[in-house]
Swiss-Prot record:
<feature type="site" description="Transition state stabilizer">
    <location>
        <position position="20"/>
    </location>
</feature>
<comment type="pathway">
    <text>Isoprenoid biosynthesis; isopentenyl diphosphate biosynthesis via DXP pathway; isopentenyl diphosphate from 1-deoxy-D-xylulose 5-phosphate: step 2/6.</text>
</comment>
<dbReference type="InterPro" id="IPR034683">
    <property type="entry name" value="IspD/TarI"/>
</dbReference>
<keyword id="KW-0808">Transferase</keyword>
<comment type="similarity">
    <text>Belongs to the IspD/TarI cytidylyltransferase family. IspD subfamily.</text>
</comment>
<dbReference type="InterPro" id="IPR001228">
    <property type="entry name" value="IspD"/>
</dbReference>
<dbReference type="InterPro" id="IPR018294">
    <property type="entry name" value="ISPD_synthase_CS"/>
</dbReference>
<comment type="function">
    <text>Catalyzes the formation of 4-diphosphocytidyl-2-C-methyl-D-erythritol from CTP and 2-C-methyl-D-erythritol 4-phosphate (MEP).</text>
</comment>
<keyword id="KW-0548">Nucleotidyltransferase</keyword>
<dbReference type="InterPro" id="IPR050088">
    <property type="entry name" value="IspD/TarI_cytidylyltransf_bact"/>
</dbReference>
<keyword id="KW-0414">Isoprene biosynthesis</keyword>
<feature type="site" description="Transition state stabilizer">
    <location>
        <position position="27"/>
    </location>
</feature>
<dbReference type="GO" id="GO:0050518">
    <property type="term" value="F:2-C-methyl-D-erythritol 4-phosphate cytidylyltransferase activity"/>
</dbReference>
<dbReference type="InterPro" id="IPR029044">
    <property type="entry name" value="Nucleotide-diphossugar_trans"/>
</dbReference>
<dbReference type="Pfam" id="PF01128">
    <property type="entry name" value="IspD"/>
</dbReference>
<protein>
    <recommendedName>
        <fullName>2-C-methyl-D-erythritol 4-phosphate cytidylyltransferase</fullName>
        <ecNumber>2.7.7.60</ecNumber>
    </recommendedName>
</protein>
<feature type="site" description="Positions MEP for the nucleophilic attack">
    <location>
        <position position="214"/>
    </location>
</feature>
Length: 236
């Protein structure tokens, strides 16, 4: 029977090591305002009324998860210890793990564990704007800076026109079966939208904002802390 009321599942790949942070601890567990970084990410997803369940995909040997108390996030949160060596592997493993629960018409929102400044209005806007879309899409922001293409010696080879260029963010939201098939067929993709594009489809860009940053380098932790400390709960 067709599901006329599709559900929304979040998948958070969190099996990476975060080597660019220069820390022995995986970056998703680095402290941020007294909690693991990923706690802030999961908290927003679990509190979102649009989201039915939140699946966090961890590495098989993750020993850090059990050292923290996640009970305050409620029953929506489900850890899956099936992560792979790449983001795409982890997302695909998560999709396969929930095959008994998700149906073809359900939506899946994939969100970076290292984007702890996701806000409720980001989720609300994404879900509302993509509700009737045949493909799905992703949060993104127009590129503001001038871009330079470098040669092999770090000299400027060309200036890249920034017109029509967008910086991809997450969540990225697609139908369950469409996303699973795209990832099963794709090779060398860095995000879900790339896999959907490789399948010949065109994801929609939903404009987000710069506060939804990804923590990649140590300075980003300080920026994330500032954003969370100064957030009012009302979209600016």
């Amino acid at each position: 029977m067709q599901n006329f009321h599709p559900r929304h599942f979040a998948i958070v790949p969190a099996a990476g090591s975060g080597s660019r942070m220069g820390s022995e601890r995986p970056k998703q567990y680095l402290p941020l305002l007294g909690k693991p970084l990923i706690y802030h990410t999961l908290s927003v997803l679990c509190a979102a009324p649009e989201i039915d369940k939140v699946f966090v995909v961890l590495s098989v040997g993750d020993a850090e998860w059990g050292r923290h108390d996640w009970r305050a996030l409620g029953p929506k949160l489900v850890p899956l210890f099936c992560g792979g060596p790449t983001r795409a592997d982890s997302v695909l493993a998560g999709l396969r793990a929930i095959a008994g629960e998700a149906v073809q018409s359900d939506w899946v929102l994939v969100h970076d564990a290292a984007r702890p400044c996701l806000a409720p209005w980001h989720i609300d806007k994404l879900v509302r704007e993509l509700a009737g879309d045949e493909v799905g899409g992703l949060l993104a922001v127009p590129v503001a800076d001038t871009l330079k293409r470098a040669d092999g010696h770090r000299h400027v080879a060309a200036t890249v026109p920034r017109d029509s260029l967008w910086q991809a963010q997450t969540p990225q939201m697609f139908r369950y079966v469409m996303l699973r098939r795209a990832l099963e067929s794709a090779t060398d993709v860095t995000d879900e939208a790339s896999a959907i594009e490789a399948a010949g489809l065109r994801p929609r860009l939903v404009q987000g904002d710069a506060t939804n940053l990804k923590v990649t380098y140590p300075l980003d932790l300080h920026l994330a802390e500032w954003i969370l400390n100064n957030r009012t709960g009302v979209q600016q």
